[in-house]
Amino acid sequence: MAIDVRPGKYDDFVSALSKHIAIIRTESGCEFIDIYRDTENENVVNVWEIWSDRPSWDAHMVNENSKAWQSVAKDFVFGETITVMDSLS
């Protein structure tokens, strides 16, 4: 996921996102999640996630933690792009 962060909000956003990700790591089906700084745009954060299966990811996207995060993120984010991929190996 590529997240467009409002200018001047990057550090605060990453701090809040790090706390959110610590919770996600405990969710059933989450095999990996981490944050990456975009090297070409200082206001873009990329989140890489690996889930054991699609139902786990779907459940994550609508759970209470994710709903709470959306209310926090709106103060920092003005756009995001989610790309869902399937492993080929």
Q: For each of these PLM feature ranges, what is it?
A:
Residues 4-13:
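Short, surface-exposed ligand-recognition loops at beta-strand->loop->(often short) alpha-helix junctions
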Residues 14-15, 63:
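Short alpha-helix boundary/capping motifs
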Residues 23-31, 50-84:
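An amphipathic, aromatic/His-enriched active-site/gating alpha helix that lines ligand/cofactor pockets
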